Amino acid sequence: MALRFPRFSQGLAQDPTTRRIWFGIATAHDFESHDDITEERLYQNIFASHFGQLAIIFLWTSGNLFHVAWQGNFEAWVQDPLHVRPIAHAIWDPHFGQPAVEAFTRGGALGPVNIAYSGVYQWWYTIGLRTNGDLYSGALFLLFLSAISLLAGWLHLQPKWKPSVSWFKNAESRLNHHLSGLFGVSSLAWTGHLVHVAIPGSRGEYVRWNNFLSILPHPQGLGPLFTGQWNLYAQNPDSSSHLFGTSQGAGTAILTLLGGFHPQTQSLWLTDMAHHHLAIAILFLLAGHMYRTNFGIGHSIKDLLEAHIPPGGRLGRGHKGLYDTINNSIHFQLGLALASLGVITSLVAQHMYSLPAYAFIAQDYTTQAALYTHHQYIAGFIMTGAFAHGAIFFIRDYNPEQNEDNVLARMLDHKEAIISHLSWASLFLGFHTLGLYVHNDVMLAFGTPEKQILIEPIFAQWIQSAHGKTSYGFDVLLSSTNSPAFNAGRSIWLPGWLNAINENSNSLFLTIGPGDFLVHHAIALGLHTTTLILVKGALDARGSKLMPDKKDFGYSFPCDGPGRGGTCDISAWDAFYLAVFWMLNTIGWVTFYWHWKHITLWQGNVSQFNESSTYLMGWLRDYLWLNSSQLINGYNPFGMNSLSVWAWMFLFGHLVWATGFMFLISWRGYWQELIETLAWAHERTPLANLIRWRDKPVALSIVQARLVGLAHFSVGYIFTYAAFLIASTSGKFG
């Protein structure tokens, strides 16, 4: 008999119902649960799939470059970055009538095109690309890397090239290579690119392979490096009148500490960024020599962890046993990696707009809004994934004997205290924040706005003042001219920084008031509640008072288990599922706040945010309703416009989102009856009944229906807000 899907589980392959298909898809990547899997094959499969992932990433980025080179207007945009709209790619659609063709023919194109709101034009321009030829060669190079990655993935599955388990578990070597090789060498290489290509490019010099060796990046070459006069590399920086991409007002410095922004591009100084990457490179190259491998020198991570025991004796055995626990658990490692990546992605969102690195990106408002929102959503999904794998670690990989009285065991011992404190914090934040908002709503409704409770965020204002913001009058640290901090940096980076922080046209340390205070606490509520659900899911994953043997049931289990009705509500999967809703909720508030504050900043009517953000009706009316008017008006009796596609996507997003509720509210019996009715009708319909299936149709389990509902809810939620964000911003600022 031919092997049926799924081949990796013969038990599932023999299931006579449609469960075979859905469970097969659900467990396709759960290598640990596959038939005849060994630890060695598990590691090798994951290793090979990493190369496949890299191949896809390189192919995708290659496609970005290729389509812009082929159908974009990069060369025209380079001539006038502030007024030419960057084109992502052409649109070919046989349904377009004349009005649609006219509406979407923009940016100097000959036919309908998509405008790029990803910031790639600004990025490529900043790093020294100037022509379509440059873009094509970049695309080809990435395509080559993609092919190499595929080849490497295939190669490492061949018997001769399969790494052994001991190779995968050699933590010191891996850390050394990742610190020195991945971060150190690549940062050094990037510094080299900035110094040799990007900085000359910003000064009007076109450096490529043909003249790379003949153009000195600095007039004195490597002299200052070898004679120890490194400060010469910082002398004669670009002047404040420098025109980016030309020699007008350009200097010769390559590694500086100017602080603040380039006045014309409103982005960080390229020479500051080169200096930053050089410092990072040196730091990581050193860090990559810290751990003991072949030569018997350096730290052993196991020894470090075994020595980490709190000296008082009242805090248990600290990090004892952690080395083997982490090194033998892929889920623990993945959880740590995802948690780190999630934090860094959110930091990217915060820093891309407040400290823009790419020339002219700060003046491209729609791109700024899109990139902030994009990175915050990605961060949210990655963070929830970190806790999911943390919970799987506790179920599959945690060994109580190996971790007696160490930090992991003590987390489990104290889980009631941890969960109840998170619960208390969430309740406190929720009731107080909502109470303030609702009080203010009532005061406005009764025509007495002066009776609102408005709280100034004085501690946050004090922190901003300490960083040099003078408008609050705190006169502390960098905002005080006679503080030691001020005097120490006065001759180097401070003038540029202070100029930037006190200039109201950028997003560095925005002025904050009572509206910010309230929304800050609303976001804190969302973060604490999301954390509560995720932490409880992980800490209760092995067992709870209600279900002490939970670990034997795995990460997700059905509600109609053996005499255990309703138990799927307490599986670790269910905690993840609930947390994603709260995560989306929280990021909704974060992005609403960011977007509304910036729209009013860019339009020059900051008072609208300040006055309307202190009560809920203000958010609903003056942010959501007011800014969705163009979307609701995307199709009207006068034909269509360039926002019509977003109006359609806004509706479509709502549809997908609402479909989610159908799966979330109805349970298994509903689907079973529906499916049996459909199957009955199918079998009695002429022609249709010629098509037969071998598997007996069974309904989604509750766990599956929740997954389908969650997927629709998330996708619809994000589509709806993406359309709203891009249309409301591009509709205002072009």
Swiss-Prot record:
Membrane-spanning segments: 46-69, 135-158, 175-199, 273-291, 330-353, 369-395, 417-439, 517-535, 575-596, 643-665, 707-727
Binding site for chlorophyll a B1: H654
Enzyme Commission number(s) from the entry: 1.97.1.12
Family: Belongs to the PsaA/PsaB family.
Gene: psaB
Matching Gene3D superfamilies: Photosystem I PsaA/PsaB
Function according to Swiss-Prot or TrEMBL: PsaA and PsaB bind P700, the primary electron donor of photosystem I (PSI), as well as the electron acceptors A0, A1 and FX. PSI is a plastocyanin-ferredoxin oxidoreductase, converting photonic excitation into a charge separation, which transfers an electron from the donor P700 chlorophyll pair to the spectroscopically characterized acceptors A0, A1, FX, FA and FB in turn. Oxidized P700 is reduced on the lumenal side of the thylakoid membrane by plastocyanin.
Membrane topology: Multi-pass membrane protein
Coiled-coil portions: none
Tagged with keyword Electron transport: yes
Sequence positions that bind phylloquinone: W671
GO biological process: photosynthesis
The entry's keywords: 4Fe-4S, Chlorophyll, Chloroplast, Chromophore, Electron transport, Iron, Iron-sulfur, Magnesium, Membrane, Metal-binding, Oxidoreductase, Photosynthesis, Photosystem I, Plastid, Thylakoid, Transmembrane, Transmembrane helix, Transport
Cellular compartment(s): Plastid, Chloroplast thylakoid membrane
Binding site for [4Fe-4S] cluster: C559, C568
The protein's name: Photosystem I P700 chlorophyll a apoprotein A2
Top-level EC class: oxidoreductase
Catalytic reactions on record: reduced [plastocyanin] + hnu + oxidized [2Fe-2S]-[ferredoxin] = oxidized [plastocyanin] + reduced [2Fe-2S]-[ferredoxin]
Classification lineage: Eukaryota, Viridiplantae, Streptophyta, Embryophyta, Tracheophyta
Residues that bind chlorophyll a B3: M662, Y670
Cofactor note: P700 is a chlorophyll a/chlorophyll a' dimer, A0 is one or more chlorophyll a, A1 is one or both phylloquinones and FX is a shared 4Fe-4S iron-sulfur center.
Subunit structure: The PsaA/B heterodimer binds the P700 chlorophyll special pair and subsequent electron acceptors. PSI consists of a core antenna complex that captures photons, and an electron transfer chain that converts photonic excitation into a charge separation. The eukaryotic PSI reaction center is composed of at least 11 subunits.
GO molecular function, one term: chlorophyll binding
UniProt superkingdom: Eukaryota
HAMAP family, per database record: PSI_PsaB
One cellular-component annotation, GO: photosystem I
